[in-house]
């Protein structure tokens, strides 16, 4: 058995937050109006080794996929049960499917989040296709409807699904947006809130042009969203501040959140703060200072510092 598995589980004395489990309307109100940001805890199989390495666990610490997923779940449970991870500054958390099905602090993860005032979301995409026409579309999601019903039964509020834009290809970006909104219709029909995530790579040489094409395609797609529905958008921080203002202020958009896209936290927060009305939905920028070797006190102090910095950048 790898050495790491002999370490004790990290535990915290659980305070009584007195926060009841939230119903859909309460979660909707929180996500739409409250101050805070959305934590992205949804690394999938392909990105898990990198996330574990950042956490201080090398690949030789596990030998099977199940051990790997067990380690990443322990990391996420440690975050979710840390005293600083509460609905005061964290609006929501995006979960990987296995995390949704697991437990934190002896409770199902969605329930544990709601008890802390944090709204649960679920990553539903199955990864990316190979690049074509400057973009990477989402792979097929054949069991989406069943997954949505299971998520809703567990108290999940919304979903997230990611595509990637590598070049300023008008036809490629139009295809990305169409696919995203087509899937969003299924999610809305299931009674869940879709987060639409067409990421523009920060490595793209024509990133600013991609931002503009994407904005205009999303504006066209929003015209077809019925008046009784809204969607959320998760976008790369634009190359030029204010590019997405029309999306932030659109009546069919509940909230626009930003991915860190490879920026370290100080730079991600500085860039985000230039875009009024955008809030963070960071993953690596949230987790980058956390290490499995830390004591409970050290871990929570590092997490609290990251939460405070990201919350402040989201409050502009």
Describe each region flagged by the PLM.
Residues 18-157, 165-167, 217-316:
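Alpha/beta catalytic barrel-like cores
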Residues 152, 173-176, 193, 200-204, ...:
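Conserved mixed alpha/beta catalytic, RNA-binding, or beta-rich assembly cores of soluble enzyme
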Residues 122, 176-190, 211-226:
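Alpha-helix-loop-beta-strand connector modules within alpha/beta enzyme cores
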Residues 3-22:
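Short, Lys/Arg-enriched N-terminal segments with co-localized hydrophobic residues
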Residues 106, 173-177, 208-211, 293:
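Conserved strand-to-helix beginnings and helix N-cap segments that scaffold or border functional pockets
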Residues 2, 67, 171:
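Short, surface-exposed alpha-helical recognition segments that flank or form part
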Residues 132-136, 159-174, 201-208:
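Surface-exposed cleft-lining segments at the edges of enzyme active sites
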Residues 157-163, 191-199, 234-235:
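Short beta-strand segments at enzyme active-site cores
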């Amino acid at each position: 058995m790898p050495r790491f598995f002999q370490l004790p589980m990290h535990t915290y004395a659980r305070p009584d937050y007195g926060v009841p489990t939230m119903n859909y309307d309460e979660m909707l109100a929180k996500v739409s109006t409250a101050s805070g940001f959305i934590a992205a805890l949804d690394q999938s199989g392909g990105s898990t080794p990198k996330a574990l390495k950042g956490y201080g666990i090398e690949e030789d610490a596990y030998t099977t996929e199940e051990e790997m997923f067990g380690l990443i779940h322990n990391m996420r449970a440690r975050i979710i049960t840390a005293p600083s991870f509460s609905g005061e500054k964290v609006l929501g958390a995006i979960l990987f499917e296995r995390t949704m099905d697991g437990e934190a602090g002896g409770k199902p993860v969605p329930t544990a989040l709601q008890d802390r005032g944090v709204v649960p979301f679920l990553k539903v995409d199955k990864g990316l296709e190979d690049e074509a026409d400057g973009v990477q579309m989402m792979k097929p999601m054949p069991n989406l409807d069943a997954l949505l019903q299971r998520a809703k039964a567990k108290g999940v509020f919304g979903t997230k699904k990611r595509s990637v834009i590598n070049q300023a290809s008008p036809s490629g970006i139009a295809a990305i947006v169409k696919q995203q909104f087509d899937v969003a219709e299924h999610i809305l029909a299931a009674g869940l809130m879709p987060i639409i995530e067409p990421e523009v790579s920060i490595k793209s040489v024509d990133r600013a042009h991609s931002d503009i094409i994407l904005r205009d395609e999303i504006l066209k797609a929003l015209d077809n969203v019925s008046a009784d529905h809204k969607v959320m958008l998760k976008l790369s921080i634009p190359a030029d501040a204010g590019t997405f203002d029309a999306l932030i202020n659109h009546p069919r958009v509940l909230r626009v959140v930003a991915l860190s896209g490879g920026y370290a936290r100080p730079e991600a927060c500085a860039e985000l703060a230039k875009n009024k009305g955008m809030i963070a939905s960071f993953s690596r920028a949230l987790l980058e200072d956390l290490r499995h070797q830390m004591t409970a006190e050290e871990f929570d102090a590092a997490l609290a510092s990251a939460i405070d910095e990201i919350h402040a950048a989201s409050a502009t």
